[in-house]
Amino acid sequence: MKNIIRTIIILLLPLTIGACATMDAAVRKVQGEYHAVQGQYYLNRGDFAAGRAAFAPRVAQWPDDPELNYFMARFELGGDKPEAALPFIQKAVKLAPANADYRFWEGVTWWALMKPDKERAAYEKALSIDPDHLSANLYLAHNMLDRGRNAEALKLYDKALSLNPDEPQAMFNRAVALERLKRDREMKLAMHRYLENYPDAPLARQGVRMLNEAGDFSWRNHVIGLRTIPLKAVEFRPGTATLTENGEASLRRIGEMLNDKADLNVHVVVYVKGDTALARDRALAVREYVRRQYPKVAPARLAPSWFGKPESIKTDTGTHSLAQSVNIFTKVQ
């Protein structure tokens, strides 16, 4: 009888162990999902200190969990502590070497520590795991651009844009790479695309300067109040004082600012080479258009002036002469 009982126990023991292992795996899966959701919550909120406080005890309890180490690295990076982040992200990479995201964030950590060679190696490893990793392609392109390896950077920005055609950093820096490669025609096309998509982005003003330095004044930076506003050039139909659609759109932006700030006044300066009368008509047309669109804006707040000569504009690349142009800027009291 004892032998029978012992045999039954021996037979049941693997089943019991297997059931426990299955239960442990299920618990770990649920815990992992919870950690992922909560970790992303802290990252999305930018509450890195709270994330660190919540995850530090868990890393102490489960030091070999790659995801916990990853989130700790992200919280330390978010708190501008790359030295503290490094051991966590390195451990995450060691525990899960095939995770492209971990490799990418290892690269970001090396970037924060100003170690460009190690940064590049981490991005390249991420791309060896996942060639379509958008962020790794993008940041490796940045690394190459910083090194002056512009042709390689351009290829990587093209790859990033093939993965996300609207990626703003790739769009802008692609134009920078083209400028450095002295491919001005392509640079202009690339920068126009960026400005059409992101006219209010912080880099838009620099983009307009790049176009202007290349002799393209289809966009202008206008100093309005305390801001510099990139706008499409205020243009008219040839030989007339009739605004184009782009010209009207740019004036609406300026009109909105004048409408919102009653103490803001601007100069409207129009140049037409060899035709002072047309320059005058265009200056008055600008003022009249804003008055019609924004009745609260008194005409006196737009001071018109006009010249029958080209506008001369100095840039870092030299002096440019525009036969016809409109310049609008803040009127100093």
Predicted regions and their residues:
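Periplasmic OmpA/Pal-like peptidoglycan-binding modules at the C-termini of bacterial envelope proteins
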Residues: L284, E288, R292-Q333
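Alpha-helical segment of the N-proximal tetratricopeptide repeat
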Residues: R28-E67, F71-E83, Q90, V108, ...
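Short coil turns that delineate tetratricopeptide repeat
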Residues: P63, P97, P131, P165, ...
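Short, surface-exposed beta-strand segments enriched in small/polar/acidic residues
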Residues: I229-G239, L251-A283, R301-K314
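Periplasmic peptidoglycan-binding/tethering modules of Gram-negative envelope proteins
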Residues: T22, A26-K29, M114, R180-N265, ...
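Canonical tetratricopeptide repeat
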Residues: V37, F71, W105, Y139, ...
